[in-house]
A protein has these predicted regions:
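Short linear sequence motif anchored by a di-proline
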Residues: 1-229
């Protein structure tokens, strides 16, 4: 599972193959579900960086209050699940991140860990949906509310030490293939499975302050390592 992650201006510098020519990313060291976050998508052959609410709202929902609005989609079912099938086929995206948090249950409570790739950042695979706001006119630029889910897979090596699921991340050579429309379902799933499995070996994690437990706390100090007593 991926339920909290980090994005910062440094992410732009660490993902040049993905974010070159796009606006700088904001600093948010405690991104939580329902937040409108930057995502990379491709339209008319060009990459752009819109914001999408974290938690997929299908286009057929009557309003934004209807649940569920899943924050994660499983790689095993994303291409066949009724909620994700169309977004996977038509609206794939990449969610840039400096890293993400996972929690380990200890005798003294839940201990957050920051999972990241040293000297790099993560290009997490996602799917998007556009929900038509019935209160807006068709020509209103705010008519369509974008939302997204992050695709996850079974975790192994370092990420598997803190949770049994992890975000499915893409390698730079696969960005165009993932965002484009020239590959079929089987090829896309194979690409994502291969990349995410290999990239997991580059990830590491360390315990961080329990201040990260509250979404009201933010700032770069949240990802600094702490010594557990």
């Amino acid at each position: 599972m991926c339920g909290r992650y980090v994005v910062s201006r440094a992410t732009s510098e660490l993902l040049p193959d993905l974010l070159a020519g796009l606006p700088d990313l904001p600093d948010d060291f405690n991104v939580a579900p329902t937040t409108a976050v930057p995502v990379v998508r491709q339209r008319h052959g060009e990459r752009e960086l819109p914001r999408a609410r974290w938690g997929l709202t299908p286009s057929w929902y009557p309003d934004l209050k209807k649940r569920p609005q899943p924050i994660n989609a499983r790689i095993e079912t994303v291409a066949t699940n009724g909620m994700f099938r169309r977004p996977f086929a038509q609206a794939r995206c990449i969610v840039p991140a400096l890293g993400y948090y996972e929690w380990v249950v200890t005798e003294t409570g839940k201990q957050p860990h920051f999972v990241h790739q040293p000297e790099a950042a993560l290009a997490m695979a996602g799917v998007m949906s556009a929900w038509p706001d019935p209160s807006k006119a068709d020509d209103d630029p705010d008519k369509w509310v974008l939302s997204m889910s992050i695709i996850t897979r079974d975790a192994h090596v370092a990420p598997g030490e803190v949770h049994d699921r992890m975000p499915a991340c893409l390698a730079p050579d696969s960005y165009d293939d993932w965002l484009g429309d020239h590959l079929g379902t089987a090829e896309l799933l194979e690409l994502l499975d291969r990349d995410s499995h290999e990239l997991a070996h580059d990830l590491t994690h360390h315990p961080v302050s329990r201040d990260a437990n509250s979404v009201r706390n933010t700032g770069p100090q949240l990802i600094e390592p702490v010594t557990l007593g």
